[in-house]
Structures are given as structure tokens and as C-alpha cells.
Amino acid sequence: MFANLDPSKSYKGITAFIVDKSNPGLSISKKEKKLGIRASSTCVLNFDDVEIPHENLLGEEGQGYKYAIGILNEGRIGIAAQMTGLSLGAFANAANYVWNDRKQFGQLIGEFQGMQHQLAQAWTEICAARYLVFNAARKKEAGEDFVKDAAMAKLYASQVAQRVSGQAIEWMGGMGFVRDGPAEKYWRDSKIGAIYEGTSNIQLTTIGKLLQKEYTK
């Protein structure tokens, strides 16, 4: 948990703590009903006069904001990888269908040039997202500055996931729209990529500020 011990210091007063679920005053209430990632529970935590002992302080006092940003920067690589995997799953599911099952006018729809162009474009974008993820992860592991690369990977991989999962439903037609298969689930799960670990607009802001810093003389 993060709490501000000295609001007069703004973000410099934020401190991290460990709070045990058995701590008096802490309760878990409403479980949210979500569009996607339903296997991961999102619940409301209530803190009613909760007292936290000093030994539960995590790290140094006043360093909570720094820790949180560090977690977010690293987490963005993971979210980018998650969204890339989602794109691959949505693509594979739809590609198998259009090249093996679905026919129109006597031929598989995957054989039509227009469909092949869409599939080729989607695959190119998925591969580009994957390389952005690999590059950000490589820099992180090497101890290099990776913040901009992580933001770019998350931004682009999230965009690709939403785009490809949506197209995949269209490629599959009615079979993509019903819940008998995973196509609609890929689409529902893709939206969170543009939200958690920093929204897409936050990624753009981060990238823009770092670019300005690089090019300002």
C-alpha cells in the first residue's frame, strides 16, 4: 500500500507499506464485474482506522513514488508482452479458420487477395510489436535506460492487440461474434492494455518528454 505521510511534501511524502490481509480495519468488499481479464479479480479494499506498525514500512520513508514509478516502468514491458501474446492468439485462431474452414463463393476466404492483405498487415504489426518488446527487455536486462522503450512497446503492442483482435472477429464473421470460440474474449481482454500500467496517453506523454530531452540543446 502507498500512503502519503506528509501531504505538504506532495509526492515526496508518499511511502510504501506492507499491509497483511488480517490487519484490523482492512476488508475486501465488492468484486468488480469487468469487460475483460475476468480471471484476475479486481476488488475494492476498505481501510477503516487501519494502523500499520513501523516494521511494515517497505523501503525508505518518502520513497514510495520512486518505487511505484519503477514498478510501472518495468511492468510496461510485461504488459506489452501480454498484449503481443494476445495478438498472436487472436491471429492464429482467425487465420486457422479463414484458411481451413470458412468459404465464400466456392473458395476459402483466406485465398482472397483483400483478406490476405489484411492478414499480412496484421502479422507485420504483431512482429513489430514483438521486436519492440524484445528491445525494451534487452535494455532492462543490460541495465540500460529503458523507460522510453518500455513506453513505446506498451503503447504499440496495446494498439496492435485491439486492432488485430477486432479484425479477427470480422474475418471469422458470425463465428467470431459468438461466445462458442475465443475470438470475442481476445477482443474484450485487449482493451485493458490501453489502461493499466499507465494509459496510452501517458505513454505518449512519457515518450514525448524523453524525446524533447534528447533533442533539446
Q: Where do the model's predicted regions map?
A:
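Long, acidic (Asp/Glu-rich), low-complexity accessory segments flanking structured domains
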Residues: 48-66
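Glycine-anchored helix-breaking recognition loops at helix->coil/strand junctions
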Residues: 31-35, 58, 99-104
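A short core secondary-structure module
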Residues: 1-28
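Alpha-helical interface subdomain recognition
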Residues: 44-46, 63, 69-217
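Exposed loop/turn and edge beta-strand positions of beta-sandwich/beta-sheet ligand-binding modules
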Residues: 13, 41, 151
